[in-house]
Amino acid sequence: LSVQVHPTDAYAQEHENGQLGKTEMWYVLDAGREAKLVYGLKQNCTKAEMRRAIADGTVMKYLQKVPIHKDDLFFIQAGTVHAIGAGAMVAEIQENSNLTYRLYDYDRVGKDGKKRELHIDKALDVANLKGSAEPKQPLRVLKYRQGVASELLTRCKYFEVYRMIVNTERRQKVHYRADEIAFRVLLCVNGCGTISYEDGNIP
């Protein structure tokens, strides 16, 4: 994944024809022994310093690399510079937006032999260029009910994420209801199961 940043809602509405910005969360599904991600900067820098680092290929000296493990969580607020490294697989839960500003792409070229477009001016407009502390895992709230553990992973104004841990020793049902206010996305990250709904089943 390229080194990138997403705008806030306010910036996107003003500069991107009324679109939404993007705040997101990563849940690590799998990670190799050396897997890392980029989360913010390890030291303060100015826009001019970052621009020079992008131009001369030394931008990585400013980026904070964080070792990751299976089941880690990272809440990535709009404006946070970030990237996924090799050996990592994450589930990305995000605000309903596709706005991404690429800050650096490791000088890679596409199938056409050309480097991918960067969005340096807009990226520097929205990026938080202050040094970041190592990201803390969000507080997890765990509740038990009838053989199912419900774990609140993240709650913000854009989305809520829960992990359901089901007792596999017996067939267990977990009920969800979708309505006109919000929808639900179900992702099986371990084991197997069946989604049942009014018109049928999905294994």
List where the protein language model places each region:
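Active-site region of the double-stranded beta-helix
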Residues: 1-70, 85-192, 196-202
